[in-house]
């Protein structure tokens, strides 16, 4: 949808004609004095349906090249195209909470349209003097994240993993925990993912009672590349309103940032640009930067972002995930080998990292325990090849103890999720950071060496492990 301020003023609108349609790319010719600006939204009536085009290039001779935000089937040469003199706009205001929109800010939840102020989706990043750096830790209630990969309010977290290792369910759990524990507002941008997942997410939010704290924006994988490329900006514009106008701390979830890059690659090819490395667009870094630089903390409030990053063929050196890395404060890497052991969330604590795992930010004890956990898991990984060839019996007593504790730590990093209750039958748990640190300290100090490793799987805190063991022992 476009701004009412512009659509109502006929005298400011210029009319062009469709002269060429190439898939999602539409060329439009205007008169000499009325050529639209880059990123202006144009409207064409396509068999009774409003189709929005976004200007991407001025190719000379009064012709602009545009990308369609919807299907172009049925579009004919010679059709009238109206220039709105405004970019695509997104709805803003508290009224958007509990609602679901498409890339144009039109409701897709079968509820009435909203009569609210709209903001253009293309904006400059906040100026340097408006920025603020905060080091306030955001407690997620997920043990492996709070202990090993803590992140701050206003930080950016990347969620890396291949297909089917649990990225989306981890995002759902974070939304659930933040809404319930911090009374926070979330904006979820579904970028180029499955429609079924969006539908499931919407109904799960209703069941969990967190929909009224969330706004959902979707551009699914069946939609044209223009919609998939711009939907992240629509979600970000809505989040910016809560930060800048309401002085709130907002959570922006993007699932999946790779699809943003992928859509940009498709658009780039359609526009005739020469591809860069591995076939990606030559403007990859610029496009990513223009999105990521707007996701930041200002003196008004903060936008904390969690971005799921699909890693093609599990290759972290691929240009799409590699470009995303440069903007992140923390990265959570999900590993298929951990998922295959039945341990969820399948976070790899050794491949994951956070710049805020620092004694001055999280405290000395937390930092020391996290470091000891990393060392134990690294030693276990180093010993695995020996165990595979010679077996556990060939290890020294000291190494056997390291392996036993590391396996308990590995199992204890698993956790039951609220959003997974109906699939697993296990009730979800929110674990406080202090309980997490205390529990892992007990394992590392050898206080629970007598308890077999199976008791640590899907236990919330160390007290639960001891209680379960004692209950079975008394039988």
Swiss-Prot record:
One GO CC term, this protein: proton-transporting ATP synthase complex
InterPro entries membership: AAA+_ATPase, ATP-synt_VA_C, ATP_synth_F1_bsu, ATPase_a/bsu_AS, ATPase_alpha/beta_chains, ATPase_F1/V1/A1_a/bsu_N, ATPase_F1/V1/A1_a/bsu_N_sf, ATPase_F1/V1/A1_a/bsu_nucl-bd
Keyword Glycoprotein: no
EC top class named in words: translocase
Gene3D superfamilies in the cross-refs: 2.40.10.170, Bovine Mitochondrial F1-atpase, Atp Synthase Beta Chain, Chain D, domain 3, P-loop containing nucleotide triphosphate hydrolases
Membrane topology: Peripheral membrane protein
Amino acids binding ATP: 161-168
Reactions it catalyzes: ATP + H2O + 4 H(+)(in) = ADP + phosphate + 5 H(+)(out)
Annotated localization: Cell membrane
Pfam families with a match to the protein in the record: ATP-synt_ab, ATP-synt_ab_N, ATP-synt_VA_C
Annotated EC: 7.1.2.2
HAMAP family the UniProt entry points to: ATP_synth_beta_bact
Described function: Produces ATP from ADP in the presence of a proton gradient across the membrane. The catalytic sites are hosted primarily by the beta subunits.
Subunit (UniProt): F-type ATPases have 2 components, CF(1) - the catalytic core - and CF(0) - the membrane proton channel. CF(1) has five subunits: alpha(3), beta(3), gamma(1), delta(1), epsilon(1). CF(0) has three main subunits: a(1), b(2) and c(9-12). The alpha and beta chains form an alternating ring which encloses part of the gamma chain. CF(1) is attached to CF(0) by a central stalk formed by the gamma and epsilon chains, while a peripheral stalk is formed by the delta and b chains.
Family, similarity comment: Belongs to the ATPase alpha/beta chains family.
Descriptive protein name: ATP synthase subunit beta
Gene name of the record: atpD
